Amino acid sequence: MAQKLAFCSVRFNLEESLEQDREKKAAILEELLDFTRQNLPAMSRTMVCDLVEMVTANIFRPLPNIEKRSGPDPLEEEDEWLEPMWGHLSLAYTILLTILEHPHFEPNSLKTVVNKPFMEKLLELFFSADANERETLKTVLHRIYGNFLSLRRFTRVRVSELLLSVIHEGDQTNTKKQVISDVNKRC
């Protein structure tokens, strides 16, 4: 299991990675998702933390600068921009949601992983140009907000600061308007 988690913790670059490695990672992520769904109550606290750390290694990444991306704003068009690695990201988010939504989930088991720095990085992902990712993030944020009482005040303050920074920058691209709308619906 440790080898699978280590392999899936590596983020692949589309230009530099082999397709067979990307396919192998997707297969292992699906296997980890099935394992999580079937065995979460029996998993040790350490194993659950390791799973969430693998998820964070996948989802927390530098985002392309929205303003500097060439071409029109991705949210202006009907054809929305998709994150090239959405297949892997989607599976990683689903693993996280499976853990957060499980009836036997104990938030205390993840206090060392799901903390203020985690929330900072999670909120930054709302600037992703991929609407699928922002939609998934809304659900993740809602589950964390509901489960981690100790992070609620921090989350409200950071969301307020995020919204104010977007508003005060004066740049009202459709993407930023969408970020405001997405975050505002959840908090």
Predicted region positions:
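Alpha-helical solenoid scaffolds in large eukaryotic transport, assembly, and signaling factors
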Residues: M1-C187
